[in-house]
Design a protein with these regions (language model features):
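Outer membrane beta-barrel
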Residues: 70-196, 233, 415-417
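Residues that define the transmembrane beta-barrel architecture of outer-membrane proteins
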Residues: 50-56, 100-105, 156-160, 220-224, ...
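Outer-membrane beta-barrel "beta-signal"
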Residues: 144, 368, 406, 414, ...
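Detector for outer-membrane/organellar transmembrane beta-barrel domains
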Residues: 242, 282-305, 310-384
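Residues on the lipid-exposed face of transmembrane beta-strands in outer-membrane beta-barrel proteins
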Residues: 39, 58-64, 74, 106-113, ...
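Repeated loop/turn-to-beta-strand initiation elements of outer-membrane beta-barrel proteins
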Residues: 31, 69-72, 115-118, 171-174, ...
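Extracellular loop and loop/strand-boundary signature of outer-membrane beta-barrel proteins
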Residues: 43-48, 91-97, 146-150, 210-214, ...
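Transmembrane beta-strands of outer-membrane beta-barrel pores
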Residues: 39-45, 78-82, 113-115, 124-126, ...
Length: 440
């Protein structure tokens, strides 16, 4: 009996010692890791009906608290889309561009000292949040290879930047941003599932398309701006300014003589400098929340098909604005209604972009969200329409929380309208989707 008791005491002591030895060091306690894995499937409904996405996506992010004032964050994302092995529908340039991806989504040093917060590294800087559009969200370039269908946190392309916020007084803060990371919007290649409609040029001469400039670090072309924010009596108001190169290419034309053959028309993608001045506003009038954004872009350029225009580009300063109202019906149906306009300071005749329907282009968006069975079954419907020409996007989705870590999502993306409109250009790209997500 004594031997058994001694053995039990020895085992308890060894277990206790082992537990003490297994105690993680302090630096491990300060580290937080999380991530997700997703399988994304999409099937195109129109002829030729076929699988359009078989993507396996992984995301891993971590945060390390050096101290109460200093922290480090990092996140990586990668994917492999097996649709390029399952079908030969897409050309080689699209496969190279979209089959695989591995990117650093965040690498951020955050320092807080008194009224000053500094964020240095690769990051997303969000100055505005709208439904299916961007008004004052101008700092980060966007990835449009899947149009605007992914979540906006996935659409934004992170940039290397210095971002600091200084609290001037209670309720008033100043944020400054500077970046040498002059990245452009990432556009789908010709032949991609969501390639944009081609500009409707009608040249009689041969045409040469020059490649776009590569993304680069450049002190001479660096970008920056500021946001001044005020919070008073429930009013959240911000004034923003940003100086940048146009994130989307503008195709300038020039005629090159090559006698005795006909002249060649050269289309040269450029990124002219623009200045954005904007304002955001938010206020809760219980039970209604009102939000508004406006951005005036100076020196904005657009392509034109006017045969008398020598370089094929015109300047049109542009005002983008929106007003939205959020309200919950019956204490369970979250409703967001948004009206937005793009207003050109000049004629829209001969302009060719699908997002410009007239001198004043008006859009209406409606998003409905609710939940059933303790929010384990969550339907969402998003409807966006261009009021000028009646093109629209309809995206219903149902998210089912299988467990605390696993979500199953079923949805669709439906488009309709004339071909040279924002949503009508994808009227043959209607699809149904199925996504399984595991978070850890």
């Amino acid at each position: 009996m004594r031997r058994v008791l001694a053995a039990a005491m020895l085992l308890a002591f060894a277990t206790s010692a082992g537990a003490e030895e297994a105690e993680p060091p302090e630096w491990v306690k300060a580290l937080r890791l999380r991530g997700r894995l997703a399988e994304e499937f999409a099937y195109r409904l129109h002829d030729p009906g076929d699988v359009s996405k078989l993507k396996t996506l992984g995301w891993l992010e971590g945060k390390y608290a050096v101290s109460e004032a200093v922290s480090l964050r990092a996140a990586v994302r990668g994917w492999y889309d097996a649709v390029f092995d399952a079908t030969d529908r897409y050309p080689a340039n699209v496969e190279r561009d979209q089959k695989t991806d591995l990117s650093l989504r965040e690498a951020l040093l955050t320092i807080g000292h008194g009224d000053l917060d500094v964020r240095l590294g690769r990051q997303q800087i969000v100055w505005g949040e709208a439904i299916s559009t961007f008004v004052t969200d101008v700092v980060n370039p966007k990835d449009f290879r899947e149009f605007v269908l992914p979540d906006f946190s996935e659409l934004r392309i992170p940039i290397w930047a210095l971002d600091f916020t200084y609290r001037l007084t209670e309720g008033v803060s100043f944020e400054g941003v500077w970046t040498p990371d002059t990245m452009h919007n990432r556009l789908p290649k010709q032949g991609a599932e969501f390639q944009f409609a081609r500009l409707p040029y009608r040249f009689r001469n041969p045409v040469v398309h020059l490649p776009d400039d590569a993304d680069e670090f450049s002190l001479g072309r660096s970008e920056g701006g500021f946001r001044l924010s005020l919070l008073r009596r429930g009013w959240d108001v911000s004034l923003v300014y940003y100086d940048q190169a146009d994130k989307s290419p503008v195709f300038f034309q020039r005629r090159v003589a090559q006698p005795p053959r006909p002249d060649v028309i050269v289309l040269d993608p450029q990124h002219p400098r623009v200045h954005v001045v904007g304002v955001t506003l938010g206020k809760s009038f219980e039970p209604v929340v009102v939000r508004a954004e406006a951005a005036y872009t100076i020196d904005k350029r657009y392509e034109t098909t006017d045969p008398l225009d020598l370089d094929g580009v015109v300047r049109r300063d542009t005002l983008d604005w929106l007003v939205g109202v959020d309200y919950t019906f019956f204490e369970r149906l979250d409703t967001a209604l948004q009206l937005s306009q793009k207003v050109l300071m000049g004629s829209a005749t001969h302009l060719t972009r699908p997002g410009v329907a007239a001198r004043v282009t008006t859009s209406l968006a409606l998003r409905l969200t609710t939940g059933f069975f303790d929010n384990t079954l969550n339907p969402t419907v998003l409807f966006v329409t261009g009021l000028n020409r009646g093109d629209f996007r309809l995206s219903p989705r149902i998210d089912y929380l299988v467990s605390g870590a696993v979500t199953l999502s079923v949805g669709a993306d439906l488009f309709e309208g004339p071909h040279q409109t924002l949503y009508g250009q994808f009227d043959r790209n209607d699809r149904v989707t199925l996504t399984t997500t595991w978070r850890f």
